[in-house]
């Protein structure tokens, strides 16, 4: 009987360890107060050039953003991902499907900072209607840097209209 009980305990410990890997972990989230504001977005349909001015109006540094556009006024959420069309410069690079605002791969886009980014889109895309930007950050978990999307801090704006600044636009 002792061997039978020991064998049952051993199997239950193994099953527990195996099932523990199936339990979802808490996802990494950005801190409250992360925010990027689209100050201006202008599109020239003849050249296919989209110029976006973003400003960090939050309380924390960010690393960059995901960017989506729509070319249909009936589409509520922009879904065309355009980071691959980024015109890279000495401060801005592509990072996967996002735009990284630092060559060092850190959260260097400080509150109050502004950046102008140019996207050279194909002229066959048509007229763009709206833009959506979702901030990104590098968060540290278990001594590892993880790239995190701040989906709850995303902003959307109609292209060609100036962004509306609130009292939080100062970054304070």
Language-model segment annotations:
Residues 1-22:
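N-terminal single-pass transmembrane signal-anchor helix
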Residues 18-172:
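N-terminal export/assembly leader peptides and their processing motifs that target proteins to secretory
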